Amino acid sequence: MGCKGIEDVAMNGRLKKEIEENGFGKMTEVQLKCIPEVLKGKDVVVQSPTGTGKTMAFLAPILSCIYDGKGRGRPGVTAVVITPTRELALQIREVAGLFDVKCECFIGGMSIEEDYKRMKEEFSIAVGTPGRLLEIVGKETKKFSSLSHLVLDEADKLLGFGFEEKLMQLLAKLPRNRVTGLFSATRNDSVDKLSRVFLRNPVSINVGNNEMPVALEYIVVSPMEKLLVLMDIVTGRRCIVFFATCSEVDFFSGLVSRAGFGNICKIHGKISQDERNRVYEEFFQRDGLLFCTDVAARGIDFRGVDLVVHFDVPKEYSSIVHRSGRTARNGSKGESVLFVMPNERAYVEFLKLKGIPAVESSYRMKSSLSYQDIKSMISPELLGLSVKAFVSYIRSYKEHFVSYILDYKGLDFDSLAELFFLERIPGMAELRNVKFEKFTKPARDGKKRALPKKKYRKKRAIK
């Protein structure tokens, strides 16, 4: 991707100097294509691979407007940036904080009373999530009456996370006479519909022929082998591992930690915002592993991540792109690996049809650990987490967006039970017609304890 210096862009001179001093002087392709159009007052719809510098592509024109005096000194807010996740909002505020502007962040999980107090202060940029911004704008509409710039970052996810109704209400409350930008790594019908309704003759900017920031490799493994391969390939690397559910993150982070892997961080939507902020800061500063759900898949810039592992097939195929974008950022190297169980092979072809090519990895299993080796590490606390993780995974799998492609009946349920190191199979409607060879299920009256069948209780190694 070609780059030029900031000196090639016509914008405020003092801002150029500060951009250079803050390490953004070498402009990326998306910045060079986007910034001039926004400075001319044009709306833009930008599709660019994740990790290519979209944040500065929309912040630079906003900052230039403020530095030129068009936003500074005028009453109210100059720009609003809407994001799908709290962490992305906090990161954008952090980048804006490098410059001579005041930027406030309004996100869920924080005190609304404190937000109302901050609204009484003067600031130029408001960044936040749709729900909290809707509350703020609804109470202080006048403060946003002079708005000149609006940005929807990760626009496809703003529509896909269930924010659509709140987003539409929020946009309806903001002034129409503004410059609007939609930014995302993927573009779908919902984004196009949104642009037709709220943008005026937008300039379409598409950077990069391939949405994927790195080549996607896949490894065909049984459920239990997923854990063994994970423990093998993450050794000594700075890695992010994505799971389907919060309970899986809790269980596997605890298990891998007991297996001797140091500095394991975990993030998911059920963790408090203060704790999420602390964990992000810890992982940002230290090497190690981050186990998470898709809450960490969008926009967050973790430098030096050289491997992304998709432990579970994501519900939305576009998540592959955004997850993979946590590595190979801004030209650095990285890898993205998808674990595919035998019943999920059709998913690889589905990805190819969606423009996300995947190649089978040459990796060969070489783990020295066995099922019994890892099982011996299971504590009573972890055993409790394992049942919750198993139940959440089964339900998530049955409700998968492409369940018609994933062969639920073809799942190796015995290996899946081993992956979660179950002592008994929990009673679940989703397992009513499932037969286990190595485990017995509870009787319908719930009185029968389901333990591994006798012939499988002996020590066994995973081949």
From Swiss-Prot:
Belongs to the DEAD box helicase family. DDX55/SPB4 subfamily. InterPro entries: DEAD/DEAH_box_helicase_dom (IPR011545), Helicase_ATP-bd (IPR014001), Helicase_C-like (IPR001650), P-loop_NTPase (IPR027417), RNA-helicase_DEAD-box_CS (IPR000629), SPB4-like_CTE (IPR025313). Residues 446-463 have a biased composition (Basic residues). A motif (DEAD box) lies at residues 153-156. Residues 226-382 form the Helicase C-terminal domain. Residues 444-463 are annotated as: Disordered. Keywords: ATP-binding, Helicase, Hydrolase, Nucleotide-binding, Nucleus, Ribosome biogenesis, RNA-binding, rRNA processing. This is ATP-dependent rRNA helicase SPB4. ATP binds at S48, P49, T50, G51, T52, G53, K54, T55. Residues 35-205 form the Helicase ATP-binding domain.
